[in-house]
């Protein structure tokens, strides 16, 4: 009887170790272009690029002060769309539009909002094209931080 109990104990212990399987880390298909982390806070906005020239912007939704919810929008670099987005933002620092600039991608709208608060600041945001009422937006960043985000540091 003792041998049978010992046999069952060994079988269950082996079975419990067999439940886990080590997963090898895959290489990320994204290369980080730039990120904004103002005043030692958690990362606010990150720009990454794939081999397919798709730029992913991941930003902390500023609607929630206590929750860290991150949103994304993607820009395919067709006809220099990435540089056009950068130039649109930089031109906005000069023209200071009162209304948000709305850009349309394949499945999202990108909102670029400029605010005047101790200088000109910009906030990036997005919403789905599928009729979602929810618009998200990032924290406001400076022109220098935009240059860092887009990898245009001089």
Set out the residue ranges of the language-model regions.
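Bacterial Sec-dependent N-terminal signal peptides
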Residues: 1-22
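Positively charged, low-complexity terminal tracts
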Residues: 18-154
């Amino acid at each position: 009887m003792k041998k049978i109990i010992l046999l069952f104990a060994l079988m269950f212990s082996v079975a419990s170790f067999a439940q886990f399987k080590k997963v090898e880390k895959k290489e990320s298909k994204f290369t980080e272009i730039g990120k904004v982390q103002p005043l030692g806070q958690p990362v606010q906005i990150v720009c990454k690029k794939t081999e397919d020239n798709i730029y992913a912007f991941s930003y902390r939704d500023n609607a929630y002060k206590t929750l860290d919810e991150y949103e994304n929008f993607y820009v395919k670099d067709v006809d220099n769309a990435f540089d056009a987005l950068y130039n649109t933002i930089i031109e906005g620092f000069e023209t200071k539009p009162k209304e948000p600039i709305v850009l349309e991608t394949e499945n999202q709208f990108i909102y670029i909002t400029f605010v005047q608060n101790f200088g000109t600041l910009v906030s990036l945001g997005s919403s789905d094209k599928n009729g979602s009422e929810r618009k998200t937006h990032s924290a406001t960043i400076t022109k220098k931080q935009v240059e860092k985000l887009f990898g245009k540091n001089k």
